[in-house]
């Protein structure tokens, strides 16, 4: 089968399409014929090998797969799999933790049953492929860590990107009053997906306003913690869900001393939350926004586009 692999760390130019062995599902795994695969900033960090821990885990020189999000059709199942059968349409993640043998930028992936769910019936494979990492980051950030409740004020910094477009819609579905931060060209799009207010960051900073927020979900990480803290209500929470890797460690070290106002986290794929996203999508309360699609052969260009940090929704690799 064809798959995207890389051996050295660097720019997207290190990515290659190669013929690799088609996987065989283990007892608890599902073999999926991949139709589409979502591209995430995480993929770019993997290719760069930054933060440095990625280089230690993945190792230099050896063949490495790429890609996390996927949607497709079940081709075969392991003997212990009970929820799926061949022909079922699924979405989820191809990686359980950082197992190097798996990557969703491929024609087939053998993935654990526990991180796959039935694909939402009312969206395309391309739309479904963009949901897992970005959708669960938005969901878990707002619900689990922001403890979002109906009627609260939420600010999403990076509202027009992959995570942000989900966050705006999820916050609205939860009954929040939502402010989105984006550039001029994306203002109308962010309004269109449900934001009550939009701040154009090319004209003003969200940290200079008078409004205080119950939850700030920050996907961009372009403002200091001190500046963001001033924008919170007394019980408000600042959720760091993205930004440059170099920013993560200082925030993590500061987190224990903020009395719960600062939270850093990485989303965890799980069946329950994939099903929450599926229900939100099938109910029409969340619609995955796809910016661009690329064929498998142009994965390097897709990663390059995501790395630039100006996507409008999700970028997806169309495999079939």
Which residues does each PLM region occupy?
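Short glycine-centered segments of the SAM/dcSAM-binding site in methyltransferase folds
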Residues: 89, 153, 177, 236-237, ...
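A short acidic, Gly/Pro-enriched loop at the edge of an enzyme's catalytic core
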Residues: 207-215
